[in-house]
């Protein structure tokens, strides 16, 4: 997958999972950014603990790399509960989920990543478990088949997804708490980079932290990945204190520019400016000019460029904006609209 090959991919790659686990915050007090989510979760968790009840079932959604798994583990730590982790694709049969549910203790948290990928059969098992803490299972086959109910201890289901729109309404409606994680601002990411640098044993000054943060596309996972590469350059160069210049040199070497664009992003923008004169252009034409398939453009390259305001979609096709010309120090055509 081309997305997995990009240094600025927000998807898990290489040893991201191992590194993320080592440096992720363990409590809400250490959780940086997402102020609305943090404030709400502090209240919900404190209230549940005061009542001596499990936290309401919680859905966390947002783009990859923003800390959904981190927040799920923080919830477990704050509630003093054990977190049992699985994912939607892993739960292939109803029996898989039943085995997990029957092994939960009171107050435990069941964390299901990629919950939008649960099959309908699994969801049917989940509904009574979430609502009534009961497990309905069928024993036997044919006319002799019968349903039995197994009482479950009160627990909290925490679901995480990058695609909340794919959740079925019955499942979505059973979550009492729904939290959306937003992209991080540069200030929050700078603080995250400084914290991660300390955990990694890297001496990074404020300017170095800022340089990594502003090229990280609003995503902590990307920031931590870029930080590791900056650490490599500093180590080989014999730099003890890493400042802006060392960080710039490392990130320029990785072809990640000041906007967080890599070579694919820049190639698409330059193609639209130089070959199509900045005019609206169809997806087929862009695909042919870039030599990339349409799915790669729509799913991998284009979303961030649109989000940052460098490309817009018009009835006549994709078009670069004034910001794209400014980014490359190109003069706007006289007839640019």
UniProtKB/Swiss-Prot annotation:
GO biological process terms on file: DNA recombination; DNA repair
Q: Which SMART domains match?
A: AAA (SM00382)
Q: Where is this region: Large ATPase domain (RuvB-L)?
A: 4-184
Q: Which reaction does it catalyse?
A: ATP + H2O = ADP + phosphate + H(+)
**Binding positions (DNA):** 313, 318
Q: Where is this region: Small ATPAse domain (RuvB-S)?
A: 185-255
Cited SUPFAM superfamilies: P-loop containing nucleoside triphosphate hydrolases, Winged helix' DNA-binding domain
Residues bound to ATP are: 23-24, 65, 68-70, 131-133, 174, 184, 221
Positions of region (Head domain (RuvB-H)): 258-337
| Record keywords | ATP-binding, Cytoplasm, DNA damage, DNA recombination, DNA repair, DNA-binding, Hydrolase, Nucleotide-binding
Q: What is known of its domains?
A: Has 3 domains, the large (RuvB-L) and small ATPase (RuvB-S) domains and the C-terminal head (RuvB-H) domain. The head domain binds DNA, while the ATPase domains jointly bind ATP, ADP or are empty depending on the state of the subunit in the translocation cycle. During a single DNA translocation step the structure of each domain remains the same, but their relative positions change.
* HAMAP family in the record: DNA_HJ_migration_RuvB
Q: Which family does it belong to?
A: Belongs to the RuvB family.
State the name under which the record lists this protein.
Holliday junction branch migration complex subunit RuvB
Gene from which the chain derives: ruvB
